[in-house]
Each structure stands twice: as C-alpha cells, then as structure tokens.
Swiss-Prot record:
Keywords for this protein: Antibiotic resistance, Lipid A biosynthesis, Lipid biosynthesis, Lipid metabolism, Lipopolysaccharide biosynthesis, Multifunctional enzyme, NAD, Oxidoreductase, Transferase
Protein's UniProt keywords contain Heme: no
Region span, Dehydrogenase ArnADH: 314-667
Function of the protein: Bifunctional enzyme that catalyzes the oxidative decarboxylation of UDP-glucuronic acid (UDP-GlcUA) to UDP-4-keto-arabinose (UDP-Ara4O) and the addition of a formyl group to UDP-4-amino-4-deoxy-L-arabinose (UDP-L-Ara4N) to form UDP-L-4-formamido-arabinose (UDP-L-Ara4FN). The modified arabinose is attached to lipid A and is required for resistance to polymyxin and cationic antimicrobial peptides.
GO cellular component: membrane
Name of encoding gene: arnA
Protein name from the UniProt record: Bifunctional polymyxin resistance protein ArnA
A GO molecular-function annotation: UDP-4-amino-4-deoxy-L-arabinose formyltransferase activity
Top-rank taxon: Bacteria
Residues holding UDP-alpha-D-glucuronate: 393, 398, 432-433, 460, 492, 526-535, 613
Annotated binding of (6R)-10-formyltetrahydrofolate, by residue: R114, V136, K137, K138, A139, D140
Amino acid sequence: MKAIVFAYHDIGCVGLNALAEAGYDIQAVFTHTDNPGENRFFSSVARVAADLALPVFAPEDVNHPLWVERIRELQPDIIFSFYYRNMLSDEILSLAPQGGFNLHGSLLPQYRGRAPINWVLVNGETETGVTLHQMVKKADAGPIAGQYKVAISDVDTALTLHAKMRDAAQELLRNLLPRMKEGPLPLTPQKEADASYFGRRTAADGEIHWQKSAFTINNLVRAVTEPYPGAFSYLGQRKLTIWRSRPLDLVHNKLPGTVLSTAPLTVACGEGALEIITGQGEAGLYVQGDRLAQEMGIVTDVRLGNKPSNTLKRRTRVLILGVNGFIGNHLTERLLQDDRYEVYGLDIGSDAISRFLGNPAFHFVEGDISIHSEWIEYHIKKCDVILPLVAIATPIEYTRNPLRVFELDFEENLKIVRDCVKYNKRIVFPSTSEVYGMCDDKEFDEDTSRLIVGPINKQRWIYSVSKQLLDRVIWAYGVKEGLKFTLFRPFNWMGPRLDNLDAARIGSSRAITQLILNLVEGSPIKLVDGGAQKRCFTDIHDGIEALFRIIENRDGCCDGRIINIGNPTNEASIRELAEMLLTSFENHELRDHFPPFAGFKDIESSAYYGKGYQDVEYRTPSIKNARRILHWQPEIAMQQTVTETLDFFLRAAVIEKTAAPKDELNA
C-alpha cells in the first residue's frame, strides 16, 4: 500500500518507523525545518527518513497547488499525519482512496487542539492516551480507528509523559497498521458533546498565580518544566523559575505568594503551600530550593508575585463608532470591566449606553459619522484600536434602501479605513457572515470558502458585496501598506438590546426582534418561506468575549486574520426559533400583559422583503480560527439566549404600555 507521510517530532519518527516495519510503500515524507528558537528535545524525522532512504521535503505551504499536484502524481493509497503541525487541505486528503489518518496525543474527543500533553498535566488529569483517527475538515474531529490509554502519575512531567506517549503510539501503530493494509478498519464517530479544545501555549502561560491551590500550581510546574521554559514568578523585578515542586496540605493564614520558610523553600498558596524543590534565578544555576533562597536573598514573609511595572501603563484607547448599537454597547460593557481600557464612542443616540455615561473611562459624543468626519479623524489619530460598527444590517433595508446601504456601509466606512492607514492605527472591522452568500460548503471557512452571491437584480446582496469589498480593501492595505487589521464575522448574534420594538414595527429589525413584536402585539408570526432557513445563533456574551480577545490581541495573534464568531451547535431554523420563543412566552411571568397568540403565518419572501430578495438555506461557521487563535469556545445554549432576550423585550414592552397613558395626559 502506497503511503504519503506528514510527520514531525518523536512521534513522527515512531510513526515513520512503524510504517516501514509494517511494509508500507512510503512514497514521500513531509516534515518541518528545525526552528532555531525552539528547544529541540526530540528526534529528527528528516534523519529517520534519510536513514530509510526516503524522499523528504519541508515545504513552507504543503497545501500550495504545486505541492498538491506533486502529491497527486505519487498516487497514494493512504495518507498519515504524525504530529505534523499544519492542517492538510481537503484537496490533499481526497487524493488518497483510503483517506488520511492522524495520530493525536490525547484520548479524543477530549483535548483536541494543540499541546495536549501539557494541557492534561495543567488540568491534573490522571489518564490520557493516543488516538489514530480519520482526518476531516475540522481539526481532530474525525472518526476513531483506535486508541491506547496512558496512566498519568503524580510525579509525571511533560517529558516523562511524552516518553510514555511515544511508547503508546508505537504499540497502537503496531496493532493497527498491519490490519489497515488488509482493508478499511471499522471507525467510531466521536461524540461532539464530550469534545474539548485547547490552543497553543506560550512561555508567558508559565507565570504562577499564587492565589490558586498548591495542587494546581504544582500541576503547572509539572506541565512546563524542562525541556519547556518552566513555571516562573518574581521577587520584585527578578525572575525565578521553578523546575520541581511538591504540593503541601498545609494550613496557614498568610497571603498567597508569601514565603513561609526558606529551608525548605515553601510558599503560601490560595489553598495549601508549595515546596520549591529545585529552581533557578534569571542569571543563576539550577539549584535546590534552599540554595535558591540564599542566592536570591529570599527571606521569610517576603512575597513572590507578578513583576511590578516600572512605569504606569496608559490604558488602551478604543474608538467605537456605533457605540450605542447592539455590539457596541455590549462591547463597551466588557471593556470597562477591565481597567486596561478606556472607550471613546460616537453614535446618534445614547439609550443603550446611558448606564456608562458616568464612568470616567467612557467618553461619548452624540453624532453622525456622515457629518462628524473631523471628530472621527481626530479620534482615530488619538486612539489605539478602531472599531467602525456603524452599518445598516437588517435584510429588509437591503432591498428597500440599497443605495443608502452602499453609502453608509461602504463609502463612509472606507473613509475610516483610509484614516487608519494614514495614522497607522489598528482596525478591528466587522465583516459579516453575509459575505459567504450562497456558499455551498458545509461549514463556511474564512480562508478557503468561496463567496457566492446572486445576480445583479437581487439587490439584497448589496450589503454582502459592500462588506466583502471592504474586506478586500482592508486586506490589500495590510499587504501593501502595513495596515494592522483583524476582520471578524459574526454569525447571528442575539441577546438583550438587539434592535428595539419600534424598529421591528417598521420591519427594520433582525428576526428574533420581529418575532417577539408579533407575540407582544398579538399579530400572527410571519414565517418567510415557511421559516425553513437555518441559522447558527450565537449568544451576545459569547460573541463579545471573542471580540474582546481580538481587541486584546495577545502577542499579535490576531493581526492579519479573519475570524468567524458563531456557535455551530446552536443551529436552528427560523420556525424552530419561533416555536422556542412561543414556549418561553407562554411560560413567562408577564404573559398576562399581552394578547393571545395569533398563530403562525407562512409568507413568500418576495411579499415580505420585495422582489430583490434572495435567501440562503443555511449559514454554518467553521470556528477553527477562533478556537486556535483566541482559545475561544462558545458555551451558551440557544434556549438560554432566547429566554433572556425575550425577558428583556417583554419587560421593556410592559414599561412602555404603563407609561403610555401618562404620556398622553402630559400631551
């Protein structure tokens, strides 16, 4: 059986040798060049391939059409990936009739993603293992061919556990590879409900937070000790690295980080205490804990902790245009919860942000972006991160006011983009799930999916193409003029303060607000084309947390990226959304304030939106970028979001009804 192998690390060497022992005809080996900045403690796949007289390559982008064509010419029967660090495209995987199989360092579906050995230790797991699974478009999500369990002892470190995993991989492959040559193995689908995902770790993640328990801190030490950079803390400005430690079940009344004794060197934790067995000063030697205390002048009752800043760091200034909107006001709330940020905002109203007006870190001006261009340019120059959230984003307006959509959504925002280029400011731009249009992929991928829209006479696509063109302009400015940017694409975010009932009364609102208005007024719920269209609904709090991490942009991880923000597990049709709303409405404590339910009414899209409308059957995001780059995973179930959104609007409607007579008297 002819095989193509993608491999790196010790596990890659194990996989390559196992294939050779099993008699596979290895056509080519793809690996990575060594990173001079990485502490390489593992064997070289390139050397093993050379010893086996196999052709070996290390392309920068194996998914490039030139490499895809070279692999096609080799006509592989099967593809294997052993700790190869890049995802393989569907095009490459389709070249092998038997498919592609990846060896992952955990018991899937748990610990999908990066650095599973480190993560299981950080989280104090007692068992892990290796999994051989079929590769699919979603990382580490394909059906399982086999697994081999590995016990984790209390004294295991990342290095000792790696050795166990290497042996486990060898045993698993010796068992499976000969059988796979005979024919396809039975595969077991993964249970998505049990899946967990973890992203890459950096050296900065090794910083110790002493308020955690001694058990938790010791797990961190085990997870990142040699050959990794190590767990660390500070004594004033001086860094110390802890290589080995022991948790102590010790009762104390000291603040976390306080040194309880120097021989042995013992530090108070939020729960228990940590004995430092070996460690190292920033420019010192690897020594025992008591010797470390002597060398660094550590004495009893001194506190270890974060490195104190020499200067008072200025808050990051975030400019939000459209700050009173749905995303704008929720994002403002999240930013103001963190004292690293201050917010400058512009909008034509302030009802949703009135709760922030007394906050000294919030600066608001009422105005229109079409008029206040000088104010906007000045504040782009003044601020650090720019979010132009002003747009017409309600479907009925795409056909009712297409030119206004273009003028505001494209022309006005293009001015802002150019000012960001002029003053070298980072822009976080709200693209949209609408740019994917009628894409026929099962999941819409930021980097590979085609953006497909309808004919010119379907004016509803003017919003989609306006946003898409801005995406392309921003990308070009990034490539040609160094603009720092991130494009984020929300997928049907919903929650309290989404639109308002007045907007729904004139049809200018999103679906859930329109449905709630029907319930509040006792009018039939209109289901456009029967409400069969499916969407993936995302809770505003999940969405805002992802957006906050984009603004935070740790280590520049979001620069030049496009990131979908949605919840694929919350997929439902508009009819299902309406039925869920109706159930919550009938059970709500304010139900008696509103008329009886008037039923569902199916209506054609042309009658509701106009002749220029065209809909899509589904819109499902791939969120691999958000998981990998932001370490983000949506958590809030659709039912909770529906309940909270409905409650917000019902209470607002009751207040509106009770206030109406008073208003009439005053008139």
